Each structure stands twice: as C-alpha cells, then as structure tokens.
UniProtKB/Swiss-Prot annotation:
It comes from Drosophila melanogaster. This is Ionotropic receptor 93a. One of its GO terms (biological process) is modulation of chemical synaptic transmission. It holds the Pfam family Lig_chan. The gene is Ir93a. InterPro entries: Insect_Ionotropic_Sensory_Rcpt, Iontro_rcpt_C.
Length: 868
C-alpha cells in the first residue's frame, strides 16, 4: 500500500473510532498493540495427561510450535511460555493459551481464563462438552469410528437437537463400540443450558436378518405409532444400518407427520451410495426428517502431533493477519487517533478466533478426519404451494413432495457448522411460502370484495380472520381462489336471475357447494376457508377442522301484547288481599266504637266516635293517611288506633313499592317461550322452516316429539316472500332458523320501524357445529386444529364472533332494561288513576242522589204524620 492511500475499511474504522471516542466515554485500552509488543502465548500440557498417554507431548509441542512460528510468522512476534501443570494461574498479560489435558481439567482451566480474559484453545479427549463457541476453540481427539458420542454431545450443546424426549434406535454393535453414547445423549448441563432428556432406548439386534428383523422392528415401532385421530409429537434418533427398513415400516404406521422429528445417521459403509430421495420416495409431505451422512475419509491419518501442528499454524496465521491490519491502519493516522481506535484485548481475541476457524475450515486435514454432512427435508406445503410463487415450478425429484437441502456439517475441530436448522419446519413452519386456499362468498363467515375484473381485493369475516391468524402463526402467505370462479365454463353467478330483495336474511352452512367438495379432493389446496356444518365426518371425502363455532336454532313469533294497565292500581295486591283489607276495615270500626262506648268514665268517651259510622270514616281516613278531628282519650282506644296506624304504614308502604314495580315492569300476555307450548296457541296456524338447515336432518334421528310434529306441519321456505315475516308480525306464523339469523331479522325491523314487533323463544336447541374443510390427504389437520384451539384460549374467535355476527339488538332483555330505566309515565300508565277518580265521582253522585231521595222520604213521612 502506498503512503498516500488508505483502504476503505480503514477509513470506516477510523471514522467509527473517532465518533466513539468523542461521544462515548470509554475505559483506557491498556493492552499493547502487536506493533509495540509481541503476542503472549501460554502452552499448558498436563503432566498427568502425558503420563497416561506415555509420550512427552510438551517436548513435541515445543518443537512443532517453534518450527511453525519460524516458518510462517511474517509479521509481529509471539512470546511463548510452556507449563506442565494444569493448575497454573495465568496472568492477564497473556493473550491466549493452548492446553492439552483431559475434559475435566479443560473446563476448570476455561473458568480460570475467563477471570483474566485469556483466549483458550483446548486440545482434549473426546466425549467432552464443547466450550462456548464464541469464547474458545476446543479440538477433541476423536478416533476414527468413535465419533458418535462427541457428535451427539455437540448436537445437544449447539442446540442442533433441542429435544426433551427421544426414542433412540441403535444397533447393538454400535452401542458396544461406543460405550459413552447413551451418556452423551442424556447429558445435561446448567453451564451450557442443556436441558435433561427423557430417553427410550431400543437396542437393535443386528444379527437378525430377513423377516425376523422386520418383525422385531415393527414390534418396536408400533409402540410409538399414533392412534386414530390422535396427535403425537415425538423425536426419533436412528443410528442403525437398517435405517431403510425403519423408514419403510414407520411409514406404514403413519409415524411420519408434522409432529414427529426423525434424525437418521447413515453409517460409513452406505453413506457414499446413499440417495435420500430414493429412501423417502413413499413418504408423504409434512414429514420432518434429516439425515447425517458419514463423509469421513478412511485414508486420513490423524495424530496428536498433526493436530498440534494445525492448531499452531492457524494461530500464527491469525496473529500475522491482525498485525498486518494494524500496520496498514497505523500508517495512515496519528498516534492519538491510533490510541483511540486500536483493538482492545477482547476484540483481538474475537478476531483471532474467527481467523482460526476460517483457516481450519479450508486447511484442516488431520484434525478433521471425521466429517458428517447433514441434509434435511423441506416438505411442508409442497403440494399446496401456489405455482406462481414456487422457487422450482417443475420438480424432477423422485418424490415431488420432498426437497433435500444441505444444512451444514460436523467436524471434531469446529463442531456443527450449519446455515440452517436441522428441522426448519418445527421452528419456521411453512417458511413463508404462498399457499392456495379455496373459499366462497358467504357472509358473515366469508365476505369477499372483488374489483371490476372479478379479482378478490378484500376478504373478511369470521373464517377469514381465522385464516389470517393461521397465516401469521404458521408463517405462510396465501392466494385465495373462489370456488364459483375456478372454471369459467362452470362458473356460478350468485346474482344472475335473482332478486336481491327476495333473498333471505342471514346465512346457512349445512349445504356445502358442490364445487368446493370437488376441488378440495385433489389435495391442491391447503384448506377450504368455508364455514361448513359438521355432519357424518367419517363418511365425507374430506376432513373437518376443529369446530370454530356452534350455532343454535330458535324460533321467532309475534311479541306478546302488553297487559292492559287500566286496573294497574289493583295490581299490587291480590284479590284475597283486597278482600282481607276490606274485612279488617269493617272489623276495626266496630271495635273502636265498642272500646269508646265501654270506657268506664263518661269524660273519656269521645262524642265524635259515638257512632259506628263516625268510627268507620275515622278508620278509612287513617288508612288514606288523612287522620281525623277526634282521638280517643282512653288508653284502650288509643291502643286500637295506634296499632291500626302501624297496619296502615305497612299497607301503604307495601302498596306504593309494588305499584312502582308494576309501573316500571309491564306485564305481557303469555307468549311462546318453548316449542312444546305451540299447542296452547291456536292463533298460530302456520309453521315455517328455512330451507337447507341441519335441523331437518337432526329431526330424523331425534326422539323429541315436538320437533317431529313441527316438521310434519312446517312449510319449507327459501325466499323472503315464502318466509312471510308479515304473518309472523300478525301472530299467525312461527319460523325456525339459526338464532343469529332471527336476531338479524329483529334488528333490521327495529331499525326500520323503531319498534319491537317480534320475540325470540327462550329455548335454543340443536347445537350445529361449524368447521372449516381440509383435504382428506392433508398432513396438517392436527396442526391447524392445535392453532384453532389456541385461538379459542386467547379469545380471538369469540372476539371475531362479536365483530361479525349480529348482536341481540335493542329488543333483547338488556336493552329492555335500559328502556325501563328511562321509562316516562304515559297515559297508558295513568288511565287506572283516572278510572279511580271517575269511580269516586260516580259513587259520590250516587250517594248524593240517595241523600236527596232520603231527604224527600223523611219530608214526606213528616207530612203524613202531621196530617194524621
């Protein structure tokens, strides 16, 4: 590089460093640059480890490392210190440390280096949990053929197999040769966040051949086969030479579905000739299956010295690259700027680790003799994916529902190097593919809005909201196909030749359009987004999902007339109470008269209460809370009057309270609350039933006689004219339909006439389950059902019902209660009051007439006496 030039990366690094130095206060970087000081490296070879292996590893290491540094370190320098005691405590001046010791000491040394921020490069035994990949480099010495324990251990540590339970099928020979295999599978660690795993181990007798082998495998697999209509989510690990037989038998037992995961290790003797497409040719889409293929070079010669040489070369190469980078940047900036932006110790260690991994990926030979490549199947939605959006519209694979991708590989030095999940569908479901979905216009379940070209531009409704949530939860987009417009020659027009004003209010789901049934049988659609009544599911050429709604039937009649309020003033008391009240008045007046007359002292006798008539008017006036001019002076009389006042208080309070209640809550004539009451209402002469209802089918198998009697007399209607809602308003007809449809009728009439003319029965009967439709061959029925249940638990579906289905409206009980709260007294309420006043005037007139007659009678009698 010329002095006047600067690399773009160096410029960006300079600007970023200057910005950080100005805006963010940082701690001083006290670790020396490679330009001013050599890198410090510690080499620790455990003495006990050398004793166990019977060779002087430290001496070999010293010679190999010095040769590598001398021959390959072109820039910078490295100061190396050697130790033979694994408990040594290194100072923070060291940049990195290379250790050769057993697994336990390796982990102990790693914990110590974290305190002093030293990069650890560990060479250790196999079957050792891998150190954190972003903080250290661990190279287990794996013998050829003994890699299974380390491989499984790495799969758990790196979350390749993040399982909590596993069913393991392993050959007896492999289990004997790898004694630590089971220990690796069940390994758990709090440090590495490895959860414990429940293990079911089945040891395959690999000496069996032919039919005996297949019978034994079938017996073992059948224990984990799903029962009918049962969803089981299990994980299977297969390490066997008989993997093809296991796949074939498991397929016949329906064990390859969206809930199960299969990791199959293909052994070295067959891996080179292995074809995943051939093995899975009979599997249906929806399976989660991955293969680990053995690509170990049988001629590779691995040794500890060779591994030490490769690790040393990778480290020296990394330090040399970083030194070159520092030189290129330092030459273009000032010393102050350099101090602000140069690498910290942790940044250097991270760069060294990445450079070493990149070097080992491309140049490692002996430390990567063992190598396994992992392939996984992409299967979900392959047959229902929209052809316009397919990445490969024409699939030439042996199984068109399977596409195998290479997700990465495993080596002892790097562990798993993966660019994709082992089971991508478990985490990402349909991986954002575009699915074909079938639907029809059927408000309020599916509401489709189309433009002038007939293309669906908006969709809503209960079913469509569920589809949208499924799309979000299962990670797919979708393309809607309307069944009536799928084939032009068979297109169905929903409006041609029809009168919109004669259409029935509401919707039904019992009759599924024939085109929907025909199109869904080809398994080309992920789901038919239509609301369909669940009926005889075992006899249909398709499957129903979990019910998304339950609709009940009811009936609509004329609202009962309100009872006349002309006698409202008598309503608070029963007839018996009124007669009893009259009786106690007639009884109390003579009692008061007698008590007053029997007073022993003449001065205690009240002149105004000396007749029964005057006592009666006194008692009557007290009842009306008017009082009187006279009051008994004797204690006996006062007791009678006092207790009568108590009776009056109770009577008046009770009467007034009940009168308010009767004013507030009107009474109605008896209506039809239950279907079995129809016989008592002779004025209802017409029975109606909507065409195409599940109620018709249900009555054929029910034992309720009132249902059967109704159906015998019912007139099936299919239009608004035949529905004859005016006859219902007149009280001559009753109709049966979904309760929500009847509520919609009541609501529309109320909005138009501002008055409630109809009443719905209190009885709701015949639960009609409504679900969506999936193809009979669909692998995703249980998956869809699981998410529908989740929507129910979260309240989504209930909310969508409230948004799209008609509410009870202003004629229901709650709305009537609101009307009662704001009730104003009108003439209907007060007519009884005026009737009482009229009755009083009439009685007064009659009494006046009687008094005139009596006066004339007395006058004539006196004249006769005078004449005589």
């Amino acid at each position: 590089m010329n002095p006047g030039e600067m690399r773009p990366s160096a410029c960006l690094l300079l600007l970023a460093g200057l910005q950080l130095s100005i805006l963010v206060p940082t701690e001083a970087n006290d670790f020396s640059s490679f330009l001013s000081a050599n890198a410090s490296l510690a080499v620790v070879v455990d003495h006990e480890y050398m004793t166990v292996h019977g060779e002087n590893i430290l001496a070999h290491f010293e010679k190999i490392l010095s040769d590598v540094i001398r021959e390959n370190l072109r820039n910078g320098g490295i100061n190396v210190k050697y130790f033979s005691w694994n408990a040594v405590r290194l100072k923070k001046d060291f940049l990195a440390a290379i250790t050769v010791t057993d697994c336990e000491n390796t982990w102990n040394f790693y914990k110590n280096t974290q305190e002093t921020s030293i990069l650890l490069i560990a060479i250790t035994d196999s079957d050792c949990p891998r150190l954190p990949l972003n903080r250290a480099l661990m190279v287990p010495i794996v013998e050829n053929g003994d890699e299974f324990p380390q491989l499984i251990l790495d799969a758990k540590v790196q979350q390749i197999l993040n399982w909590k339970t596993a069913v393991v099928f392993v050959d007896q020979t492999i289990l004997e040769e790898n004694a630590l295999l089971v220990k690796s599978i069940v390994h758990e660690s709090i440090t590495n966040h490895i959860t414990p795993i429940s293990l079911i181990l089945y040891e395959i007798n690999d000496s069996l051949r032919g039919q005996q082998k297949r019978v034994a495998l079938r017996q073992a697999l059948s224990q984990f086969a799903p029962k009918k209509h049962e969803e089981m989510r299990q994980q299977f690990l297969v390490i066997s030479a008989f993997h093809e037989d296991i796949i074939e038998i498991a397929e016949t037992l329906n064990m390859f579905h969206v809930g199960n995961q299969w990791m199959i290790f293909v052994l070295d003797m067959v891996a080179r000739d292995f074809d995943a497409g051939t093995v899975t040719i009979n599997l249906d889409e929806g399976a989660n299956i991955a293969f680990a293929l053995n690509e170990t070079d049988p001629n590779c010669q691995d040794s500890l010295n060779c591994t030490i040489s490769e690790i040393s070369l990778a480290l020296v190469n990394a330090i040399s690259k970083i030194t070159v980078e520092e030189e290129s940047i330092y030459g273009e900036i000032s010393d102050e700027e350099w101090e602000a932006i140069r690498f910290t110790k942790q940044e250097k260690q991270a760069e060294i680790l990445e450079y070493m991994k990149e070097f080992l990926k491309t140049n490692a030979k002996c430390s990567s003799c063992a190598r396994w490549r992992v392939e996984t199947a992409i299967t979900w939605g392959k047959s229902q994916e929209n052809r316009k959006f397919r990445s490969t519209p024409q699939r030439d694979a042996k199984n068109r529902n399977f596409e195998f991708i290479n997700i990465g590989y495993w080596t002892p030095v790097l562990g798993f190097v993966c660019q994709e999940l082992a089971f991508p569908h478990i985490e990402h479901h349909f991986r954002n593919i575009t699915m074909d979905i079938l639907t029809v216009h059927n408000p309020p379940w599916q509401i489709l809005t189309k433009n002038s070209n007939g293309v669906i531009v908006e969709h809503k409704g209960i079913v469509m909201e569920i589809v949208k949530e499924l799309s979000r939860a299962l990670n797919f987009s979708y393309y809607l196909h309307e069944a009536s417009a799928w084939k032009e020659e068979d297109s169905l027009s929903t409006s041609a030749g029809g009168n919109e004003s004669d259409e029935l209010v509401g919707s039904m789901t019992f009759r599924i359009p024939y085109r929907v049934v025909e199109m869904v049988q080809g398994n080309q659609f992920f789901i038919a987004a239509v609301a369909a009544t669940v009926e005889d599911p075992d006899q249909k050429p398709f499957n129903y999902t979990q019910p998304i709604s339950v609709q009940k039937y009811s009936f609509i009649t004329r609202k009962p007339d309100e009872v006349s309020r002309i006698y409202l003033f008598t309503a608070p008391f029963t007839v018996e109470t009124w007669f009893c009240l009259m009786g106690i008045i007639l009884l109390t007046a003579p009692t008061l008269y007698a008590i007053n007359r029997l007073a022993p002292l003449k001065e205690m006798r009240i002149v105004g209460l000396s007749t029964v008539k005057s006592c009666f008017w006194y008692i009557f006036g007290a009842l009306l809370q008017q009082g009187g001019m006279y009051l008994p002076t004797a204690d006996s009389g006062r007791l009678v009057v006092g207790f009568w006042w108590i009776v009056v208080i109770v009577l008046v309070t009770t009467y007034c309270g009940n009168l308010v209640a009767f004013l507030t809550f009107p009474k109605f004539q008896p209506g039809v609350d239950y279907l079995n009451q129809l016989e008592d209402h002779k004025d209802i002469v017409q029975y109606g039933l909507r065409n195409g209802t599940f109620f018709e089918r249900y009555v054929q198998s029910t034992t309720r006689e009132d249902f059967k009697h109704y159906l015998e007399r019912a007139k099936i209607y299919g239009s608004a004219q035949e529905e004859d809602i005016e006859a219902v308003k007149r009280g001559e007809r009753i109709n049966i339909d979904w309760r929500i449809n009847l509520q919609l009728i009541v609501q529309r009439h109320f909005e138009r006439e501002k008055e409630c003319h109809f009443a719905l029965g209190r009885e709701s009967f015949v639960d009609e389950q409504i679900a969506m439709i999936v193809p009979a061959q669909s692998a995703y029925l249980h998956l869809v059902n699981r998410h529908i249940k989740s929507m129910f638990r979260m309240g989504f579906i209930e909310r969508w019902h409230q948004m799209n289905l008609p509410s009870a409206g202003k004629c229901n009980g709650k709305s009537a209660q609101r009307q009662v709260t704001n009730h104003k007294v009108n003439m209907d309420d007060m007519q009884g009051c005026f009737l009482v006043l009229l009755l009083g005037f009439t009685l007064a007139l009659l009494i006046v007439c009687g008094e005139f007659w009596y006066r004339r009678f007395r006058a004539s009698r006196k004249r006769r006496q005078f004449t005589n």
